[in-house]
A protein has these predicted regions:
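C-terminal alpha-helical "lid/dimerization" subdomain adjacent to the S-adenosyl-L-methionine
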Residues: 64-88
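A short glycine-rich, Lys/Arg-flanked "PGG" loop and its adjoining helix->strand segment in the class I
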Residues: 26-48
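Short conserved loop adjoining the S-adenosyl-L-methionine
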Residues: 2-6, 21
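Short alpha-helix
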Residues: 82-109
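Short "lid" loop at the C-terminus of a central beta-strand within the Rossmann-like core
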Residues: 18, 52-57, 109-114
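A conserved beta-strand element that flanks and buttresses the S-adenosyl-L-methionine
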Residues: 12-15
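Conserved class I S-adenosyl-L-methionine
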Residues: 46-73
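C-terminal lobe and adjacent flexible extensions of AdoMet/dcAdoMet transferase-like proteins
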Residues: 111, 116-201
Length: 201
């Protein structure tokens, strides 16, 4: 463990939390890890967690699980392959964060996922009818496991108000205190335009 002389305004865990069960003997590795992180934050500091959603729509369509490469592995509790990591649903992740001592959480939904997002929705700004046309969905070198086209299903997911459950990944802002002021509710990176017209809003 590294000792720090000062506490931090922000700490980011980008693709980190899911591996904590692999490198510790703790009975509650994810909660214990976040408690340590919490102790490194200033009183008004924030923790940002980026992680895959084990129930992400791409996985229901047959895309390989990001950590094991085995389709449907995460939603099957990794019983089909070697458990290299542990991902969570929105409800599970929120519960872990709250049990770790964080008072406030705010969920963002990077699309197509947190690794290469072109659009970021939030719990205060969800897609209304269709997902944004700026979203660049992944193509897979080996598409033999795919059983459906992810991009064509989102309309029905949105219509039935289950987008937050099926979002491919989460970006979670965690705070020690409530009422953190104004938040960004929607962001888009328009990088498919001519270079002089590219922008982020």
């Amino acid at each position: 463990d590294i000792e720090f002389d000062e506490k931090f305004d922000y700490i980011t865990l980008i693709g980190v939390l899911e591996y904590q069960g692999k490198y510790t003997d703790s009975q509650n590795p994810y909660i214990d890890f976040l408690k340590k992180i919490k102790g490194l934050l200033k009183e008004d500091g924030k923790l940002l967690i980026a992680i895959e959603n084990k129930y992400g729509l791409k996985y229901w369509c047959g895309a390989p699980e990001d950590h094991t490469g085995v389709p449907f592995d995460g939603m099957n509790q990794y019983c089909l392959g070697q458990k290299a990591a542990q991902t969570f649903s929105r409800e599970e992740l929120n519960e872990i964060v709250k049990e770790s001592g964080f008072s406030d959480t705010y969920f963002y939904y990077p699309m197509p996922d947190y690794k290469l997002p072109t659009v970021i929705y939030s719990e205060k700004y969800l897609p209304k009818n269709e997902v944004d046309s700026n979203i660049m969905f992944y193509s897979y070198p080996d598409n033999t496991t795919l059983i459906a086209d992810e991009s064509s299903i989102y309309h029905d997911v949105i219509k039935n108000h289950v987008f937050e459950f099926f979002a491919n990944s989460f970006l979670v802002e965690c705070s020690l205190k409530k009422d953190q002021g104004e938040r960004v509710i929607y962001a888009v990176n328009s990088n498919e335009r001519q270079k002089e017209l590219e922008c982020i809003t």
